[in-house]
Regions:
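Catalytic-core signature of thiol
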Residues: 1-268
Length: 268
């Protein structure tokens, strides 16, 4: 909706598919649990780096697995209303994102010349005010779990998965950190030639595995129409929430720019 959290919804659906494949269990996991923990980790890293890090709503696939690995996971039905403690039924994070960025930016200025022991608690309290509280324990099919023990029951293991990519500014057949702002955790991806990357993906799908695909939805040629347009005319990347980048602001019609006839370099 009006948030920059598409990365969490898409990556968590991949995790749910993997659980169905490996355990035969259908689960609906809490996206906002992951988002809340991600905010916290991001704030700590932002402060450690004196503000020299992207602090925004966007993130990447690996963030979801990192959060599950570090904090566990909670079913959606035990967090109904969590993440929406501010009067809307869908994520609307513009105010929250601005408040959190303002808070960590003030902390980075270090007015006391040393960090207090209270700053992270203050950050947590802002997130809790907007999101609500997470249950410490919950019961599924008669068994009581914590977020960590539920993760272990589901068998989600970060080390079971690998990122692959295809860029020409790094050597092939080696891992590297993809230099984009949303990769704030500095996860590495194994670099393959484009045709080999596609071959790996098709092979995985043919064998019954799920693929999580990461793309930049802020690019002007990105649409829901099942194609990618690379116009000769260069335009500025779209700003705003994921929803606005996909289909325009809620009050607007879908973006007419991508429907306009322009000279094209390539249509895929």
């Amino acid at each position: 909706y009006r948030s920059g959290t598409c990365w969490c919804f898409s990556a968590l659906s991949f995790v749910e598919s993997e659980i169905l494949r490996t355990k035969g269990v259908e689960v609906d996991l809490s996206e906002m649990f992951v988002v809340g923990k991600s905010y916290r980790d991001r704030a700590i890293k932002y402060v450690r780096l004196d503000g020299h890090l992207n602090f925004a709503a966007g993130s990447s696939f690996g963030d979801v697995l990192h959060v599950i690995d570090d904090y566990g996971i909670v079913p959606q039905n035990f967090t109904e209303g969590y993440g929406f403690n501010y009067g809307t039924e869908l994520p609307e994070h513009n105010e929250l994102d601005a408040a959190l960025k303002g808070y960590v930016s003030a902390i980075v200025k270090n007015p006391n010349r040393t960090l207090s022991t209270a700053w992270i608690n203050g950050f947590d309290n802002i997130v809790e005010a907007y999101f609500g509280e997470i249950p410490a324990t919950f019961t599924v099919d008669g068994v009581e779990y914590t977020p960590e023990s539920y993760r272990d029951f589901l068998g989600i293991n970060y080390d079971d998965y690998v990122n692959i990519t295809s860029f020409t500014h790094h050597p092939f057949y080696e891992p590297f950190v993809i230099e984009v702002c949303d990769n704030w955790r500095w996860d590495t991806a194994y670099n393959l030639p484009m045709d080999e990357m596609m071959e790996v993906m098709y092979n995985a799908i043919d064998k019954g595995y799920t693929i999580a695909w990461g793309s930049d939805v802020s690019e002007k040629g990105f649409t829901r129409d099942g194609l990618a347009v690379m116009p000769v005319e260069k335009k500025q990347a779209a700003a705003g929430s994921d929803q606005e980048r996909w289909v325009g602001k809620a009050a607007d019609a879908p973006k007419e720019e991508v429907k306009a006839e322009l000279p094209e370099e390539m249509v895929i």
